């Protein structure tokens, strides 16, 4: 994304980007929690705030970061992540909107250019009928394209094929698959894993390999070795982020 690359000038040094970060504000009056009980939501209680993360970020040599809206903590209230991205030029926000709220289109328009760089289509728990690629939700994709927002999709395995449909219809839109769609990629024979790998045929689909994916691979394979080479065989290294 152009805003993430802007201003980077370290000669001989590759930019290191944390592509999936969740933070929780310490000021609960200004940024009240609106919890959703997703499995594993306990992390919300121990998550760092922006000041704590920035120190860790500097010590680890991370140049920039994508602050992903945590649905488990704030659902569709993006106030905290937008506040952080407005104060810290090295952090960029990925927001969630309510697809059923008619005011969401205006919400997207109000995102400040260069601070919010992506939308996260959050479809968990899975709906009875998938909405991410539904014609009546096309306005989300069109508005995202108009504002040059990357589209991140967080779904469970039963909606993986919907991502392919979206990637085909909106072929100029980058589509990032959060958590590799929760596919059990350690088992290459699993139909869900095959559905994920089939998305490689769409050049605008990118896989996000988060710690959930890495931990699952290690638990089943005993080592991280082989994970990224396996995914790169299908998607290439240029379409993997972690």
What is the meaning of each model-derived region?
Residues 56-106:
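A metal-dependent hydrolase metal-coordination microenvironment
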Residues 17-21, 65-68, 92-95, 117-121, ...:
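Hydrophobic faces of well-ordered beta-strands that scaffold small-molecule active sites
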Residues 22, 70, 96-100, 122-126, ...:
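Active-site beta-loop-alpha junctions enriched in small/polar residues
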Residues 133-242:
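Catalytic pocket-lining loop regions of alpha/beta-barrel enzymes
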Residues 37-46, 92-100, 125, 129-131:
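Active-site mouth loops of central-metabolism enzymes
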Residues 101-153:
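Hydrophobic alpha-helical segments and helix pairs
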Residues 3-70, 75-76, 112:
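An N-terminally biased module of ancient metal coordination in phosphate/nucleic-acid-related enzymes
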